[in-house]
Amino acid sequence: MKNTFLIEIETEELPPKSLKAIAQSFNKQIIEKSKTYYLKYKQTKWFATPRRIAVMILDINTSDTNFYLQTKGPSIKNAFDKLGNPTSIMKFWMQKMNIKIHEITYLNTNKGSWVTCSKITNKKSIQEILIELCRLAIKNISIPTFMKWSNNDIQFSRPVRNVIMLLNHEIIRNNVLGLETNRLLSGHKFMTNNKIILNHAYQYPELLLNSGKVIADYDARKHKIQKHASIAAQSVNGILKIKTTLLEEITALVEWPTILLATFKKRFLNLPQEILVHIIEKKQRCLPIYSTNNGTILNSFVVVSNIETSYPNNIVRGNERVIHAQFVDAEFFFKKDTKKKLIDYKPLLKKIIFHDTLGTLLDKTHRIKKLITWISKFTHANVNDCIRAADLSKCDLVTNMTFEFPECQGIIGMYYALHDLEPKNIAIAIKEQYQPKFSKDNLPSNTISYSLALADKIDTLTGLFSINKNYNISEKDPFSLRRLATGIMRIIIKKNIHINLYDLLEKSLKTYKKINNSDIILKKEIQFLFNRIYSIYDKNKYNHSIIKSILENNTKILTNIDPKIKAITYVFKNHPKILQNLIITQKRVSNILKQFKENISFNINMKTLEQIEEIKLIEQLNIIEKKYKHPFSKETYISMMLTLNSFCQLIHEFFNKVMINHKIVSIKNNRLAILFKIQNLFFTISNFSNININITI
């Protein structure tokens, strides 16, 4: 059997939402620190359950390790003469270091080359190395929050109850986190009583499985939950739509997952589906089952129990009772809330403070109405529907249902609006006003929805910047302004809203009373929003300089930024020489224009054209302008760049054969006007001169 090392840290219940990250961090630190000690092995494997994290190192080299100190000697130039013989300086250094000529090594750097020697400074046994390695790894585990216990200063995510360190059969004796290491395993908290003796490190997962009723392998446990829960759903002609975060959390809550099927009364299916799902998933950590026919929720759900028992019905009934009680509450709130119309809750918004300095939610509603009225011109949404959506947008925040289930704000408003027979698009807008909630969340689906979402987000951003224009979000972001700004930019860019960003922010500022230094606030907001554009595309590994080259010519109107970035990226990856030609040509045009500070008219006088090169140039220029008057898609921009690439040949011929700085001022100005027009044609896509094609996308 090959050499195996194991370290297990047994704790009290670890936080389920961070269990996987803690275990993976432990494994990562073991790998990183093993490099420091030149430890050779085949692979590592990590384990995690609610009450333990462990790392196993497989096929480990157990030989003692020599640690070397590298000493730098004289430079190569001073170490050897022209014949390659050691100089007196070199001989003195060799004598000092007590080494022979064959023992020297060489160090080559950008600053020069030197002779060096490596000498053994320390020899450590594998046991010593593993003790130090684990100490450093534990010290550097990434843990969200630490806690102390007992009367010592030791800190960990949760109190530590036992530590195992085994190299094959041998216990690595050490004090770890205040406890002496041993070979005693703890099995399942409820299904086993006695400690389990671990004779060999390699037996760890198998012994826990067979004797301890614990599936230590996190991924194996997760796979079992997925597989058996799906089988349970199929038994009632249903399917699961398991959210990744929920599956990870459930996996981190159980050591021995047992799948059970539970039900609730069909009458509760009349409640909003999102409320049912929220209660089942968030409140009870169970899995809702959906119909295979229409995707709606069924009156069955999956319970993932942490115990295998002879009386599973007791567990099922316990979960059903809890679910039933919460559904009854939701049913009561729904009936009570819908006794009056959603719009009738609007006056109550004056009792809810939006922000101490920014007024109430009723004040916010009035500002959103003013802003959405203006925004609707650019989103082509029905202005009356937009105003109605704004009036209703925050009304559900004062209902009983939202008070009980605050995570469902907007969703509840949508159902109440539909109950009041409001138009469907308006109801959907109430739900979607908070989208996108995270970087990859869906955008609002209709014009009213993204008009309302934009107005709501801009109002919040402007308000918070107005009370703190030096808002520091470098580390902490208590109001989630980064997420808010990302949502604003995604809506404008992805929905291709032809709106002036400066005007939008100015309109928002004017809806607030008594705002000072609005110019400073506006400047700060613009910079903040533009930084989010970089963030959006940087995450998808787009070239930073490409984004910058486009934004320089789109400081106010953000239309077509997305297809431009994707088009230039496509040409960059597939036709780099074409992009390089566009960059060189535009730089040449720009450099000439920089030499002339006069105000040159953009009007080209055709009568002043003298040479065939400038005539050909202006003819082709007019053709391209007409062809690409409204280039909106990625494909059109790619086509335009390929056309401009051919056009570059005429530009270079113009430069080579036509005197720009003509002695006759009218001719010179006319030729400069041609160059200005060419530059503006390039600017239709990007300021190519700012693109760094050496950066890897």
UniProtKB/Swiss-Prot annotation:
It catalyses: tRNA(Gly) + glycine + ATP = glycyl-tRNA(Gly) + AMP + diphosphate. GO terms for molecular function: arginine-tRNA ligase activity; ATP binding; glycine-tRNA ligase activity. GO terms for cellular component: cytosol. Keywords: Aminoacyl-tRNA synthetase, ATP-binding, Cytoplasm, Ligase, Nucleotide-binding, Protein biosynthesis. The keyword Aminoacyl-tRNA synthetase applies. Its main location: cytoplasm. One of its GO terms (biological process) is glycyl-tRNA aminoacylation. It is found in: Cytoplasm. Its EC number is 6.1.1.14. It holds the Pfam family DALR_1. InterPro entries: DALR_anticod-bd, Gly-tRNA-synth_bsu, Gly-tRNA-synth_heterodimer. Tetramer of two alpha and two beta subunits. Belongs to the class-II aminoacyl-tRNA synthetase family. This is Glycine--tRNA ligase beta subunit. It comes from Buchnera aphidicola subsp. Baizongia pistaciae (strain Bp).
